[in-house]
Amino acid sequence: MKAILLVLLCTFAATNADTLCIGYHANNSTDTVDTVLEKNVTVTHSVNLLEDRHNGKLCKLGGIAPLHLGKCNIAGWILGNPECELLFTVSSWSYIVETSNSDNGTCYPGDFINYEELREQLSSVSSFERFEIFPKTSSWPNHETNKGVTASCPYAGANSFYRNLIWLVKKGSSYPKLSESYVNNKGKEVLVLWGIHHPPTSTDQQSLYQNADAYVFVGSSKYNRKFKPEIAARPKVRGQAGRMNYYWTLIEPGDTITFEATGNLVVPRYAFAMNRGSGSGIIISDAPVHDCNTKCQTPKGAINTSLPFQNIHPVTIGECPKYVKSTKLRMATGLRNIPSIQSRGLFGAIAGFIEGGWTGMIDGWYGYHHQNGQGSGYAADQKSTQNAIDGITNKVNSVIEKMNMQFTAVGKEFNNLEKRIENLNKKVDDGFLDVWTYNAELLVLLENERTLDFHDSNVKNLYEKVRSQLRNNAKEIGNGCFEFYHKCDDTCMESVKNGTYDYPKYSEESKLNREEIDGVKLESTRVYQILAIYSTVASSLVLLVSLGAISFWMCSNGSLQCRICI
């Protein structure tokens, strides 16, 4: 009975002791992040750095609508293909859109010289002034300006020609030498286009230009070239055995361009005074145009985001995140969100000495749970939580600011003869893209590792702060908890939490209780030893009596014979 009372006393004393535990916040978050050492670590809070959503629409950029070329391409639009007539009045745009079936380009067959370079030039133009550089009615009185039409460029069922060019042919039976100049007084670059016609036969050459040995000269301060028609039989394209090559140049302000010819010249009628804009570009997209606004446009759709990375499309126009190949870039801001003990990190992980987080503590990341005679409850440590929030917020903002270099990234133009250069360029671009992706992923992995270790150390520091105050006035019972050797009411608990715990005040009470508990433990140990000896002896006696009784019974009924020899 004495032993039982001692055991009950010990249990009662342990059960009624006041306790204080250090712990951390937990919630129902399913966010996962990757670190250098682990993948898919569940955390309480995180921020996404990778945009993977778009609206599937072509939108205005900065409030300015794009120029959608429809079934026309750049060549058809800038030369004035009759099928592109609806585009001729457009003078400004945010970016230019071609579609995958933009087939209306050069209606009269031939080569557009340096077409890819022209596209590059136009990709940085946001508006232009289309003006009549050589008026049709007054510039060419000695040449025919209305008969230069062709069935390959029809309009409304009749033969027609490019709206921005004039195909000059002989007037009557003569094609006198022409010489016309234009001085650029627009104060900006002027784009001028012209063409050279190459007939299939000498008969066609004479019927169109009269002069068998014709030439064309075009010159400015930066461009000088003499052309001779190449008369030769060729396979018909769009019903034409002849060919027409198209040329262009940029005239600087104050510069002069001169056209001199005795035949075969397709002269410019309209030219373009260009205004460049850094946010413009050319994209190929089949997405529909909508009345929406965005800061970043891709061929797949518009992106409205402040995130530093996107994996939607490498071609972008406007203020856009950097494209990476990653499928996930999530940065941890909160703590591990797991209920079981797992060791990890510089400090052995939060769960190295605390089993799991507290969903009941909702007003901070780190804090306390106490239990005493006045009740129990959770309380966050606001100072350490706020310091952690400030530090992590500054870090996240710094990462986003450093990586959020928004810019336009458009494709480069190469013609069919430059495939090797194009392939090399793609390899270089892919290499840069791989480096960007690797750097972004490594940065996130390292920062996630540091953040989780940072939280681990904060919980550890909070635990050490309490332990250093309590010293031997309480004992560590594991799982981040302390059991007081003295009564600790709510005021006492609060003093531990805010760092003002009065150790000497409770030392004497703690010493007495500690000695009493140690004495109870010692007496309990002695009683248990006596009980163990008693039970061993009693068990042996019962076993011997049982064996004797069985032997006597077996001898009495003859089942067992006993012989005693002397």
UniProtKB/Swiss-Prot annotation:
Which cysteines bridge via disulfide bonds? C21-C481, C59-C292, C72-C84, C107-C153, C296-C320, C488-C492
Q: Which GO terms describe its biological process?
A: clathrin-dependent endocytosis of virus by host cell; fusion of virus membrane with host endosome membrane; fusion of virus membrane with host plasma membrane; viral budding from plasma membrane; virion attachment to host cell
**Primary location:** virion
Membrane topology according to the record: Single-pass type I membrane protein
Molecular function via GO: host cell surface receptor binding
List the signal peptide residues.
Answer: 1-17
Q: Which UniProt keywords apply?
A: Clathrin- and caveolin-independent endocytosis of virus by host, Clathrin-mediated endocytosis of virus by host, Disulfide bond, Fusion of virus membrane with host endosomal membrane, Fusion of virus membrane with host membrane, Glycoprotein, Hemagglutinin, Host cell membrane, Host membrane, Host-virus interaction, Lipoprotein, Membrane, Palmitate, Signal, Transmembrane, Transmembrane helix, Viral attachment to host cell, Viral envelope protein, Viral penetration into host cytoplasm, Virion, Virus endocytosis by host, Virus entry into host cell
Posttranslational modification: Palmitoylated.
Q: Where is this site: Cleavage?
A: R344, G345
Q: Where are the transmembrane segments?
A: 530-550
Q: Extracellular side of the membrane: what ranges?
A: 18-529
Q: How does it assemble?
A: Homotrimer of disulfide-linked HA1-HA2. Interacts with human CACNA1C.
Regarding protein family, the annotation reads: Belongs to the influenza viruses hemagglutinin family.
Q: Which HAMAP family match?
A: INFV_HEMA
The name under which this protein is listed is Hemagglutinin
* Organism of derivation: Influenza A virus (strain A/Swine/Wisconsin/1/1967 H1N1)
Which gene is this protein's source?
A: HA
